[in-house]
Amino acid sequence: MPQTLPSAVPTPAEIAEALSRRILGQEEAVREISVALSKQLAGLRVGNILMIGSSGTGKTTLMRAVEGYLASDPVLVARSAVVRIHANVLGEEAERGRPGEVVLGRLLERAREQLGPSAPVDMLLRRAASGLVFVDEVDKIRSHVGGQSNVAGIRAQEALLTLIENEAVPLTLPAWAGGASVVVNSSDLLFVCAGAFEGLYDSVFDRVTIGRDRGALQPVTVVEGGKVAEKLVFHLRDWLRNEDLFDYGMSPQFLSRFDAVVLLQDLGQDELVRIFLETPESAFHQSRGYFESRGIHLAISPNAVRRIATEAGRQPRLGARALKEVFRRVIRDYEFDPTRSITGGALLIDLPEVEAVLGKA
């Protein structure tokens, strides 16, 4: 008979709505994560996800948003332990001959934090075995770098494979849990692996323009500035194939364990503006908190925000991180002397103040 979902399990749409308050402009990634998380919370088997996106496009922010979402609901906290780990750590553990122990150990500790120190060890192990594992910078465990074999990367991929597909992973329990050696079925873990995959964009572009698929990408006619011209329009999502990831250094066995490969989009000006104004972690909101602590209300005009976003957009490989660097240049003198240009207890940053630092667009 079909399995009936517990009534408390949120739908993918409900999860996506909550995550979208923290992560902007990455609808596909949010949808994939939301579906996978809803299934896992219901106790269903779910496929793993590989996220590819330039620095600053929101990979880590999305991971943190999921953690925050689960932590905000006591019912959900009791159903899923979540850990984040750097991919290279898996390689280091594999070299010590205990692949997977660090991940399962952290999940066990996380489950204990959530369920309390008096929770039975068997219950904690069950929670850990159905946890959510975010693996950051997974592109750093490629099998080769600069034409040279990367032994640590190979071992890390093998260690991650062991966790993803193995139903019998050995784990030595910590002292507080008795210190015994147990075997954990890790096949119910949900893995979300993410990386920037620097150089992948260029290698795929070369493949379809000057490489083995030369001519596959054809120029299109566009009108720019009132002039008709031919232009190559390239989007990685349209041309990325598994063999491109193989060539990058991710093994076929490793990639076959991911049901979805999600490409995060580089952020446009509209997304950068929203991130700057709407996300609580933005440089603007952090600076506003600083000024409020001194009794000053910080405001910024729409034109000034647009100019900052335009400048940040010139560094597409940095994504939203470029906003922090650009805004820092604008605001640092005001933060040094908070009383500068104050009118009626407020500081307004307008376009002239921004252009005085950045120049005209």
Regions found by a protein language model. Give the residues of each.
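Hydrophobic positions in the central parallel beta-sheet of the AAA+
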Residues: V83, V133-D136, V262
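Short conserved motifs of the RecA-like P-loop NTPase core
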Residues: P12-S20, I141-R142, G289-R314
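C-terminal engagement/docking regions of AAA+ P-loop ATPases
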Residues: T61-R64, V192, S203, I210-L217, ...
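A short hydrophobic beta-strand->loop->alpha-helix junction that borders the nucleotide-binding pocket
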Residues: R84-E92
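Interdomain "pre-motor" coupling segment immediately N-terminal to P-loop NTPase/helicase cores
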Residues: M1-V9
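Canonical AAA+ ATPase core
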Residues: I52, T61-P74, G91, E109-D122, ...
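Walker A/P-loop
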Residues: L41-I85
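Pre-Walker A (pre-P-loop) alpha-helix and adjacent loop at the N terminus of AAA/AAA+ ATPase modules
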Residues: V9-N48
